[in-house]
C-alpha cells in the first residue's frame, strides 16, 4: 500500500510540473489517503503483535 501511495505521489509531482492541476490534485488526494491508511494499519499491527 505504501508502494501505491509513492506511485501516486510521483504522478502528482509530474502532473504538477507539467501544469495539469486537476490530475495533480486528484493524485495527491489518492496518495494522501493511501498513506494515512498505511500508517493506521502499521500502528494497529504493531500493537497486535504478540510478545517475542
UniProtKB/Swiss-Prot annotation:
Coiled coil: none annotated. The keyword Transmembrane helix applies. InterPro entries: DUF1328. It is a multi-pass membrane protein. It holds the Pfam family DUF1328. The chain crosses the membrane at residues 5-25, 27-47. It is found in: Cell membrane. Keywords: Cell membrane, Membrane, Transmembrane, Transmembrane helix. It comes from the Bacteria. GO terms for cellular component: plasma membrane. Belongs to the UPF0391 family. This is UPF0391 membrane protein XOO4217. It comes from Xanthomonas oryzae pv. oryzae (strain KACC10331 / KXO85).
Amino acid at each position: 500500500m505504501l508502494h501505491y501511495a509513492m506511485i501516486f505521489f510521483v504522478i502528482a509531482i509530474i502532473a504538477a510540473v507539467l501544469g495539469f492541476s486537476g490530475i495533480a490534485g486528484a493524485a495527491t488526494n489518492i496518495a494522501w489517503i493511501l498513506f494515512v491508511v498505511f500508517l493506521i494499519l502499521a500502528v494497529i499491527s504493531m500493537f497486535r503483535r504478540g510478545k517475542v
